[in-house]
Structures are given as C-alpha cells and as structure tokens.
Amino acid sequence: MKRRKYFGTDGIRGKVGSMPITPDFILKLGWAAGKVLSRFSGGRSNYIIIGKDTRISGYMLESALESGLAAAGLSAALTGPMPTPAIAYLTRTFRAEAGIVISASHNPFYDNGIKFFSIKGTKLDNEVEHSIEIELEKCLTCVDPKELGKASRIVDAAGRYIEFCKGTFPAHLSLRKLKIIVDCANGATYHIAPSVFRELGANVTTIACRPNGVNINKECGTTDIRQLRAHVLAKKADLGIAYDGDGDRVIMVDHFGNKVDGDQMLYIIAREKLHCKQLTGGIVGTLMSNMGLVLALKQLNIPFIRSNVGDRCVLAMLKKQGWNIGGENSGHIVLLDKTTTGDGIIVALQVLSAMVNNCVSLHELCNDVSLLPQILVNVYCSSIKSPLESDLVRKETKAVEQELSEQGRVLLRQSGTEPYIRIMVEGNCCYGKILYLANRIASVIRSEIKSIQ
C-alpha cells in the first residue's frame, strides 16, 4: 500500500496553525472523510459523532470538521469534551456512521489532532485512511443545498459513558473503603473519571481537573506524576490514578508513591483473570514491554507475544491470536472483553477490582512482577532523513548491546506521533549504568542530526 501522507500511527496530528492542523485543511478533511466513510459503511445513519478534549483549539477544529461533513451531506452529533474511548463507545451504541475525536492525547496544548473510529468503535483500517487521503486530492464539491448536513448535541453523552464504565466493575464489589487521588491532566476525563469512582463508593480527591484550554497535560497526567505522588503521600491515600489528555492511557501510584506502569497493570489484570478462570489465551505487549513482565507471566504459564509499538499494532496482534488483553508500558491497555479500544478508566477499574477482590494493596499486587531498570530517552529530530540509518549510530548501538550482553537490550525508533527519536535501553544492572548507556547513544544521534540538517 502507498505510504500515507497525513495519517500517522494514531490519526493525524501536529502543531495548531501549521499543516495539516489548519482550519482550511480540517474542513476539507471533514468533507473527504464524510464521502469515504459513507461509502464504506453503506450510509446507514448519515451522521458522525464528534468529541474533543479540552484544548482551546478544539472549538475551531470542531467547527471546521462540522462544516466539511455538512458539505459532504453528513450531519454531526457533538458531545463536547469527552474521552477518546467514550467516542468509540458512543459511536457503536448510537450506530453512527463513524466517530471523530479532536485530540493530541498526551501532547502539549499547542498540538492537536484528528482520529477516527469506525461504526464498530474500532480504529479505521489502513485501507479507509488511504481512501481518505485519495479523496483529499480532489476538489471539494458541495452536495445539493437540500442534502446539507446539520449539527446537533448529545446532551446525555457523559451520563451514558459513566454508566458504561461502572458496568465493567463487578456488581458484587465496592470501592467504599478506598481513598483515591485522581489526576485528570486537565483533560477530557475531568468530568467523567471522578464521578465513576465516587459512584462506586470511593473517597475521591481530584487534581488537574480544572481545564482552561491551555493547561492540558501541563505538569500533570501520565507524563508527569510528581504532583500525583505528592498528593498520595500527603493525603495518605490508598493509591493515585493519572490520565492523559484524552483518557486512553492510565498510570497509577501506590500508597508508597511508587509508579505502577502499563506493564505492571497488564500483569495484575492477567493474573486476576487467570485466577478467576476468565483468561483467554495470553497477553500481547510491544517491543517496549519490560523483560520483567515477560518473566513474571512465564511463572504463571501465561503466553506473551510482542507487537510493534502502538495500539493499532497491539489490536492487530490480539485479533490474530484471538486473545483479549494487550497493551503498552505507557499505560495504553486494550481489554477486548470490555470494550473496543484503550480505555484508561476501565483499565483502572479492573486493577481496583483485583485489589478489592483479594483484599490487598496496589503495592502488594505488584510484588510478583519485578521490572528491570529501563530508560527511555527522547531526542528531538525534525529532519526528513533519519539519523538511525547512520553507520556511527549503528556502531554505537552495537557497542552498547555488547556491553549489556544477554542481560539487556536496546531499541531505537522514530515516534509515530511526535518529532522524536525514542531510545530505550533495558538491562539487569544498576539504573545509573542504563542511563549512562542510553545517553551515549543519544549523544551520537544528536551529532548525526546536526550533520544532516
């Protein structure tokens, strides 16, 4: 298939005001997507659900999308700020033509993006995204005035989704004795996640739940848990839960302030499913998954397979294997027996149910999975030519791998959503040495970037 021009690993993303995140391009994207999605779904409902996170640019892009869809003859049903997985859920329950989310996930406020869901609440196939890109090359033509789309609002979207989330928590259990700190990253979960946990009985304290359009992910959320850790310790809470800007990722903190990442949550959920005789097959991780997770699952005789990085790759591998549970150490976890895409609230509820069901703390649930020291270093790279093709980078990478021997590994990759080279080094040695080795590779990559710019 031809290389895609606009779509990355998670929709279309970029800096607001620069191509492709401009009002004129997004309007045409709405038109092109409307034409293509109608074709693929057979025009069953004639409307598309649009949700967004809390970025100030969301209003502008929402209006542009709405106009483009109307020109293609499709109506827009607006939800306002809602988590990405909520749009996936609403799209399939409303039998909408498709769902669109305006969000750049964990990125800063000045970035934004567009991602699509099919009528089934799943990410679009490559074929559909390719067809949208072909349509974008055509001239925009408006339907007859009588066939123009309209806009409406789904007023009970939040309530519907809250009830859906609560329904994934065992009916015989309660969160009544738990004290939880919830960090909503000033993002799309701010009016959802606290309500879910409170309605299930938890004593909830919120932080980063006052979005103003420009504070999304700022010193909070899954990418910065310092504030959450401090509140958990100060309030003597049982645990803390952090979301990213659009709510498809979750990171937790135990009562000692220790970070609990996606790998540890995958282990907790898998073990609980195994004990309850509800585990289908094994677990799908990614190239970034910690060796500690692999070894812990092996102790339970649970199969483990790695996919490429990204929830799309995890989902593809789950489908291929016929399994239900997979995810990334970033906290993006997919539970296909519960929903169709990564959902931070639902994942947190499954971890909480394991705590309550076994009458143990989050810290105790993590006792049997010992993660190896792992470092992720990001190097900014806007160059079209990749420095990863350099002989010097390859030579340094090989030298580091030899130093780690069979006790570790190195992974270099270009991010699919941001202009960064990701350098992951993992090994069965002290943290300081892992950091030193990662920075050695980063230094060579930075030198190569300078030489090719």
Curated annotation (Swiss-Prot):
Query: Which Pfam families does the record cross-reference, listed alphabetically?
Result: PGM_PMM_I, PGM_PMM_II, PGM_PMM_III, PGM_PMM_IV
Taxonomy, superkingdom? Bacteria
Gene Ontology terms: biological process: carbohydrate metabolic process; peptidoglycan biosynthetic process; UDP-N-acetylglucosamine biosynthetic process
Modifications made to the protein after synthesis: Activated by phosphorylation.
Concerning HAMAP family, the annotation shows: GlmM_B
| Chain residues that bind Mg(2+) | S105, D244, D246, D248
Which organism is this protein's natural source? Blochmanniella pennsylvanica (strain BPEN)
Q: Which residues carry this modification: Phosphoserine?
A: S105
In the UniProt entry, which residues are flagged as the active site?
A: S105
**What job does this protein perform?**
Catalyzes the conversion of glucosamine-6-phosphate to glucosamine-1-phosphate.
Q: What InterPro entries does its record include?
A: A-D-PHexomutase_a/b/a-I, A-D-PHexomutase_a/b/a-I/II/III, A-D-PHexomutase_a/b/a-II, A-D-PHexomutase_a/b/a-III, A-D-PHexomutase_C, A-D-PHexomutase_C_sf, A-D-PHexomutase_CS, Alpha-D-phosphohexomutase_SF
User: Which transformation does this protein catalyse, written as a reaction?
Assistant: alpha-D-glucosamine 1-phosphate = D-glucosamine 6-phosphate
User: What is the protein's name according to its record?
Assistant: Phosphoglucosamine mutase
Supply one GO CC term from the record.
Answer: cytosol
Q: Which family does it belong to?
A: Belongs to the phosphohexose mutase family.
Enzyme Commission code(s) on record: 5.4.2.10
- Which controlled-vocabulary keywords does the entry list? Isomerase, Magnesium, Metal-binding, Phosphoprotein
Which metal ions or organic cofactors does this protein require, according to UniProt? Mg(2+)
Q: What class of enzyme is it?
A: isomerase
State if Transferase is listed as a keyword.
no
SUPFAM superfamilies, alphabetized: Phosphoglucomutase, C-terminal domain, Phosphoglucomutase, first 3 domains
Q: Name one GO molecular function term.
A: phosphoglucosamine mutase activity
Q: Which residues form a coiled coil?
A: none
Name the residues that span the membrane: none
Gene3D superfamilies named among the record's database cross-references:
Alpha-D-Glucose-1,6-Bisphosphate, subunit A, domain 3 (3.40.120.10), Alpha-D-phosphohexomutase, C-terminal domain (3.30.310.50)
Provide the cofactor note recorded for this chain's UniProt entry.
Binds 1 Mg(2+) ion per subunit.
